[in-house]
Structure formats: C-alpha cells, structure tokens
Curated annotation (Swiss-Prot):
Any Pfam family matching the protein: GTP_EFTU_D2
Species of origin: Alkaliphilus metalliredigens (strain QYMF)
Residue numbers spanned by region G1: 19-26
EC number: 3.6.5.3
Region G3, annotated ranges: 82-85
Residues reported in the UniProt entry to bind GTP: 19-26, 82-86, 137-140
Region spans: G4: 137-140
Protein's name according to its UniProt entry: Elongation factor Tu 2
Molecular function GO terms recorded: GTP binding; GTPase activity; translation elongation factor activity
Top-rank lineage group of the source organism: Bacteria
Family, similarity comment: Belongs to the TRAFAC class translation factor GTPase superfamily. Classic translation factor GTPase family. EF-Tu/EF-1A subfamily.
Cell location: Cytoplasm
Subunit record text: Monomer.
Length: 397
C-alpha cells in the first residue's frame, strides 16, 4: 500500500489546453492521457470522443462545457481541462471555473497562429494564467524545416506581444494524432518531452495556506462581554489569535483590528486556515462598524479600490442574460465575493456597444471602494440576475 500514499504526496498542478479551433487541443489531451498511461502506468487512457463530449457545468450562473482529465508524470500529479468550443474557453477563463497554474498553447504547424491563438494568449494575460508552454502540433504534415522555424518564431512573437517571455518559452514540435496512434513510438517521446518542459517551466503553485490571510465577511454579530464576531469562509492564508489584521473595503482606508479569538463549530481554536468556516472575534470595533462586503485580511496585503480594467463576458439571451446590447456609461451592480456594489462601465475607444455573447476589456468605476486585486472574479448583475462575468485585469486607482 506504500505506493498509493506516495502518489498523494506528489505536488498537484492545474493545467489546460488553449489555442485555435481544430489545431488539435482535444487530440493532444487524449494523446497525453494515453502516453502517460503507456509510459508510467498512471492515470487512465481517455479516448478523444469522451473528452469531446464534455459535460456542461454551471459556474456563477453560466453554463460551460469542460472536460477534466487527470494524469501523472514522475514528479507531479496534473489535473487538465479542455473545452470543446471557443466560447467555453472565454467563459472558463473569465469565470475562473477552471483555474490554471499554466497552459499548453496548441498551434498547428500546418496553419500557424490564427485569431483564437492570439485571443487565448491575450485572455491568459488578462485573467492571470501565469505560464504558457507551446506544443506545435501536426508537425508530421510539414516537411519543410524552415516553415516549422517560421511558425515557431511567429508564436514566440505573439507571446512577447502579450508580455509572456516568448524567447525563453519551451516550444515542443510533435503530432498529437501520431502519438495517439503509437504512444510508445517517437511521437510519444514528444509528449514526454512536452511534460519534461512543463514540469520545469510551470512552477509548483503556492498553496492557499501559504498566501496572505483573507476572509470575506458574510455575517456580523456581537457577543455580550466578548465583542464583535465576523463570520465567513477563509479564502486563503492563516489567521492566529492575538494577530493584528485589517478590515478592508466600503471605506476609504483599511482599519486595523486585533483578533481575540477564532471559533469553528463552537470550538475555540488558536488559528483558522484556508477553507475553514469560522467566526473571528475582534477587539475594538462595534457591530455596526463592520458589514458584509468587507474583507478581513493580512495588513497591507490588499487595498480598497474603485477603478480598474476588467475582462468581461456578457451572457447571451439563451443563458439568461440581457436581450439587448448595453452602451458606454451602463450602470449595473457588480457582485464581489459577498455583496453587490453599483458601478459604471467605460467602453474602449471605438466600441459603440456590447452585445450579449461578447467578451470585452472595459474600465469599471465603483461607487464604493472594494478590496480588489488582479485576478479577482466578479459577476455583473441587474436586479439580482447575472448578466455577465468578469475578472480584474489591472488596478487604476
């Protein structure tokens, strides 16, 4: 039984395939599972059509088709997402339904970079996918060595354009279809080569417990003689009794507080950590001075902001979204973590309106400050129904 225990101790990394339609993302996903199974005896081989018929999931009220497969290398355990359609990628990346620690950009060597190749790189930059490795696919169809080099250069240029280190990014040339047919052969070697690159290029993600403490406030009440309690689920980090933390959001400046107790299931703890549903007892604040929508966080780790750039997906009518476009100056509610805040939208130069089903970069200004940082997800709502999803791309003020 020693083996199973060892498997669990491998670092876990989330990755996904991105790239233009028909460049071979799903074929590569299938080829990876079969090659890994063939070479390492780990994971199950998953057939192409199983991945292609991805089940629908709902994330923040949005239906997304996503296929999930798992496999292992010598060093790591990987969870891999693949989406059947371009729209599914856009929704997936913006809602963070499948958070990626890194991505495999699949580009057909026979076609070179195409519009969605570029769009997926841009989306990766906007939503904070930190690392990309390139798999030039269908190399069996290209006899001309110079053509391969040309495509590789084009992809590297694209990566540089969107602030990824294009010159240093690993680029592996292979054929997913050939690896699928013969995982033990030379094309299978290319899949192994791809994962040697991924194992080294995509670093191990920082565990949630190692990040700075943050807990969105869900509810507040006072305990006579003991003080004010804020309840919620700790999103990341660790909070200890007697520690000084900050209350952030809905006011201009964060307010410093001291934790006098942490409770979980009516038991007192020395500390709470990521994933725990806790009540945090606070000294020096009245019940009416803290509210849902604020966060408790490690002092200095997050600031309140009102203005930022965001990447937004607008729901289609069929998804329960708006039936009509919206224009510059549109004022919906923005739902962050636990609360709605009104704000207004500024569209990019030359964009007149946004149609249901579009994805777009926009500037958002909120009427009250919210604890915000790059990568924070939010929903856009009108009268309580979700009409869009977004992610903070960069802070303005």
């Amino acid at each position: 039984m020693g083996k199973a225990k060892y498997e669990r101790s491998k670092p876990h990394v989330n990755i996904g395939t991105i790239g233009h339609v028909d460049h071979g993302k799903t074929t590569l996903t299938a080829a990876i599972t079969i090659t890994m199974h063939n070479r390492y005896g780990t994971g199950g081989a998953v057939a192409f059509d199983m991945i292609d018929k991805a089940p629908e999931e709902r994330e923040r009220g949005i239906t997304i088709s996503t296929a999930h497969v798992e496999y292992e290398t010598d060093k790591r355990h990987y969870a891999h997402v693949d989406c059947p359609g371009h729209a599914d990628y856009v929704k997936n990346m913006i809602t963070g339904a499948a958070q990626m620690d890194g991505a495999i950009l699949v580009c057909s060597a026979a076609d070179g970079p195409m519009p969605q190749t570029r769009e997926h790189i841009l989306l990766s930059r906007q939503v904070g996918v930190p690392y990309i490795v390139v798999f030039l696919n269908k190399c069996d169809m290209v006899d001309d060595e110079e053509l391969l080099e040309l495509v590789e250069m084009e992809v590297r240029d694209l990566l540089n354009m969107y602030e990824f280190p294009g010159d240093d990014t690993p680029v592996i040339m292979g054929s997913a279809l050939k690896a699928l047919e013969d995982p033990a052969g030379p094309w299978g070697d290319k899949i192994v080569e791809l994962f040697d690159a991924i194992d080294t290029w995509i670093p191990e993600p920082v565990r949630d417990t190692d990040k700075p403490f943050l807990m969105p406030v869900e509810d507040v009440f006072s305990i006579t003689g003991r003080g004010t309690v804020a309840t919620g689920r700790i999103e990341r980090g660790i909070v200890k009794v007697q520690e000084e933390i900050s209350l952030v959001g809905l006011s201009e400046a964060p307010r410093k507080l001291v934790v006098t107790g942490v409770e979980m299931f009516r038991k007192l703890l020395d500390q709470g950590q990521a994933g725990d549903n806790v009540g945090i007892l606070l000294r020096g604040i009245q019940r009416d001075e803290i509210e849902r929508g604020q966060v408790l966080a490690k002092t200095g780790s997050i600031q309140p902001h009102t203005k930022f750039m965001a990447e937004v997906y607008v729901l289609k009518k069929e998804e329960g979204g708006r039936h009509t476009p919206f224009f510059d100056g549109y004022r919906p509610q923005f739902y962050f973590r636990t609360t709605d805040v009104t704000g207004s939208i500024k569209l990019p130069e030359g964009v007149e309106m946004v149609m249901p089903g579009d994805n777009i970069t926009m500037e958002i200004e909120l009427i009250s400050p919210i604890a915000t940082e790059e990568g924070l997800r939010f929903a856009i709502r009108e009268g309580g129904r979700t009409v869009g999803a977004g992610v903070v791309a960069s802070i303005i003020e």
